[in-house]
A protein has these predicted regions:
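Conserved beta-strand-loop-alpha-helix hinge in the C-terminal portion
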Residues: 216-227
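ABC family nucleotide-binding domain
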Residues: 1-212, 217
Length: 227
């Protein structure tokens, strides 16, 4: 369960405080696929950073599986992210000098997990890249690079996957395929997926839409889509 309670995030602008998020609250049950939508500047990415423990709120709390992130040190939050959280970004963030399988394998090895190569190969096969294991990022299309990034994000079997505009650099067809892949992994792995997107068509493919405007939740609805 991911719970946000009265989240507020303020930044100092000269002599004034600028509130980017204002008293945001919701709960996301485990295994749900949720989209956070809203116009540019609505606070989507700021909210994602708070939910993931990458930033701390000015007021309010975030809980992951009953653990209040506010009660944790920075090192403890980093440890929790490594154990329970996966990330996918718009810019892929692959290491260009590593092959597809190495990009997935290296984080596993750094965590000391046995069978890292086998797990990496299995994940890449599941995202449809079993024949691209030894390709470098520059030899892959944008959609293929994002699939490598998704495989890497699921390598630690996360309880929650945060995806920040994962289709933003892709054409419509490829973006749809990426969301279909996230849906399949959400169902198969049981991970909660929190997707930030500006594309309402993409959002409608998830189970629930939380809409922000000017840092406030203005809509929270189920889409009728099942995982």
């Amino acid at each position: 369960m991911l719970v946000a309670r009265n989240l507020t995030k303020e930044y100092q602008s000269g002599t004034q405080k600028l509130a980017v998020l204002k008293d945001v609250s919701f709960a996301i049950p485990q295994g749900t696929f949720v989209a956070i939508v809203g116009p540019s500047g609505s606070g989507k990415t700021t909210l994602l950073g708070l939910l993931a423990g990458l930033d701390v709120p000015s007021r309010g709390t975030v809980e992951i599986d009953g653990v209040d992130l506010h009660d944790l040190s920075e090192d403890a939050r980093a440890l929790l992210r490594g154990q329970k959280v996966g990330f996918v970004f718009q810019s892929f963030q692959l290491i260009p000098t590593l092959t597809a399988i190495e990009n997935v394998q290296v984080p596993l090895e750094l965590r000391g997990e046995p069978g890292a190569a086998a797990r990496a190969g299995e994940l890449l096969a599941r995202v449809g890249l079993g024949d691209r294991l030894d390709h470098f990022p520059t030899q892959l299309s944008g959609g293929e690079q994002q699939r490598v990034a998704i495989a890497r994000a699921f390598s630690n079997r996360p309880r929650i996957l945060f995806a920040d505009e994962p289709t933003g650099n892709l054409d419509g067809t490829t973006g749809t395929r990426i969301v279909e892949l996230l849906t399949a992994l959400n169902r198969e792995e049981g991970a909660t997926v929190v997707l930030v997107t500006h594309d309402i068509g993409i959002a409608e493919r998830t189970q629930r839409i939380i809409r922000l405007a000017d840092g406030v939740v203005v809509e929270d609805k189920l889409t009728g889509t099942t995982a």
